[in-house]
Regions:
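Polybasic/polar functional segments that serve as interface/processing modules
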Residues: 1-115
Length: 115
């Protein structure tokens, strides 16, 4: 995971994004559709149409960073809204990147005592 400064906000871009876009295209989308500054130091997360690929745009103070992750199975959980942004915590971002439902995390395995 990236070492984010303490005051960094994490924004999910609701809806579907054309992930053929790179630094320039995603920065323009942050400015026009999300009405944010891509050089603010905040993290912006985008999801493609199929839902198995996300891109993360972040300005680290020296330059823009663009990270991508594709799930081999399943889809990333995404907000139902078709436009705007949703704010995440760092823990929720970690869950999102692992393919976990960050809206309602549940324990899927509980250890059993040996008898």
């Amino acid at each position: 995971m990236m070492g984010l400064p303490a005051n960094t906000r994490i924004w999910i871009a609701a809806g579907v994004t054309d992930l053929r876009r790179g630094f320039t295209g995603l920065s323009a989308q942050v400015q026009t559709k999300l009405e944010q500054n891509p050089f603010s130091g905040h993290v912006f997360v985008f999801r493609g149409r199929r839902g198995d690929l996300i891109k993360v745009l972040w300005f680290d103070g020296d330059g823009l960073c663009l990270f991508a992750k594709r799930l081999e199975r399943g889809r990333f959980v995404w907000p139902q809204a078709t436009s705007g942004t949703v704010s995440l915590t760092r823990a929720q971002l970690s869950m999102l990147l692992e393919g976990i439902d960050w809206r309602r995390p549940e324990r899927t395995w509980e250890p059993q005592l040996s008898v």
